[in-house]
Amino acid sequence: MDDIFTQCREGNAVAVRLWLDNTENDLNQGDDHGFSPLHWACREGRSAVVEMLIMRGARINVMNRGDDTPLHLAASHGHRDIVQKLLQYKADINAVNEHGNVPLHYACFWGQDQVAEDLVANGALVSICNKYGEMPVDKAKAPLRELLRERAEKMGQNLNRIPYKDTFWKGTTRTRPRNGTLNKHSGIDFKQLNFLTKLNENHSGELWKGRWQGNDIVVKVLKVRDWSTRKSRDFNEECPRLRIFSHPNVLPVLGACQSPPAPHPTLITHWMPYGSLYNVLHEGTNFVVDQSQAVKFALDMARGMAFLHTLEPLIPRHALNSRSVMIDEDMTARISMADVKFSFQCPGRMYAPAWVAPEALQKKPEDTNIRSADMWSFAVLLWELVTREVPFADLSNMEIGMRVALEGLRPTIPPGISPHVCKLMKICMNEDPAKRPKFDMIVPILEKMQDK
């Protein structure tokens, strides 16, 4: 079978769908020139493939090596339907490439008149200069130039030149496609790992920042008492299910080192510069989580969980809380598979009871509806996002577990929060597990809240 980039270029929708259905495939990977599958589908005008990639979570504003976004390519080649689709999904209309050109520069230069009109109607700036001091309208033929100026003026644009700023990108991050080779390795040679800084140590092991094959990674070294052949076999059998590359809101385990030869069983995952949602909310990272960012994080988590809940069988021993949600460089929340517990790791122990549903604290896992219990955990995350507080911060884990399970201890919803969020939280935290919604039911609710 040809590679995914060829399938997207040629518009082979059936092959693309089959490829996307394999959880080990990463739809945001790039080829040698940094083109993602979405770049190729947009360049070649493959509408059905573009739609499919976007619905599966392709990053809209991803940049190739020349800093072109999919919108630059669709505008250059005059694919009006795709330009409109990208704009519908919030593509950055004034994204700047390495030459300082925005998509409108290319639509004007290549004489894509209708596309140029659509871009201006959606807020593309007609007088933004590239590195060479040229505005998009300088690239257009006379009739189009006049038309675009007139349209822009009607929309309230100032037609004075906007000089090129080299500092345009300061304070934002450029979204690059991921290295497409990382999902090809499942067994990793421990000797190839370069351990740089210890990030954390707790009951379950050590967390390190490291390098592997030129990539920043996180290395999780598991502490396991009495390592045996049986535990080694379980580790080998359970690891492959954690390599989920096919959803943008799930952070896969890249690979593992078996012990022996490694001194301890070890997991490798992508480095996330902002750390976990817990770090972002409670440990003073450099950006503010306002209401709209909180809703976006909630939507990311709901989409990731909705996907995980489609897997049969479900991934066991996965605990949803703010320490097991990682924040990517483009502010995307991702459910971490490296935080899933293995069958040999302290069965029956709860290390974050504040996020655990009361029935899951009272019953054995096999007697609990895991999907409903996850929805309770999500409700606590919603509470955490709107209050910026750690749930039950003044109590020990043992007290929290006992009081949530036996005394009806619950997070109190403070006054003054959005009535929509408040209502959603109450629905998700229904005392009757059977009455809690499914994640695929709350995704559209969060999407509406985001649009508002």
From Swiss-Prot:
Residues 180-212 are annotated as: PH-like. The modification Phosphothreonine is found at T173. Residues 33-139 are annotated as: Interaction with LIMS1. GO terms for cellular component: cell cortex; centrosome; chromatin; cytoplasm; focal adhesion; lamellipodium; nucleus; plasma membrane. It is found in: Cell junction, Focal adhesion; Cell membrane; Cell projection, Lamellipodium; Cytoplasm, Myofibril, Sarcomere. ANK repeats lie at residues 2-30, 31-63, 64-96, 97-129, 130-174. Phosphorylation by PAK1 modulates ILK subcellular location by promoting its nuclear export. A motif (Nuclear localization signal) lies at residues 363-371. One of its GO terms (molecular function) is protein kinase activity. Its main location: other. ATP binds at N200, N202, H203, S204, H270, M272, N279, K341. It is a peripheral membrane protein. The kinase domain is likely to have lost catalytic activity but retains ATP-binding activity. ATP structurally stabilizes the kinase domain and promotes stability of binding to PARVA as well as focal adhesion stability. Component of the heterotrimeric IPP (ILK-PINCH-PARVIN) complex composed of ILK, LIMS1/PINCH and PARVA; the complex binds to F-actin via the C-terminal tail of LIMS1 and the N-terminal region of PARVA, promoting F-actin filament bundling. Formation of the IPP complex is dependent on protein kinase C and precedes integrin-mediated cell adhesion and spreading. ILK also interacts with LIMS2/PINCH2 and with PARVB and PARVG which may substitute for LIMS1 and PARVA in the IPP complex; PARVA and PARVB compete for the same binding site. This is Scaffold protein ILK. It comes from Pongo abelii (Sumatran orangutan). The lineage of its organism: Eukaryota, Metazoa, Chordata, Craniata, Vertebrata. The gene is ILK.
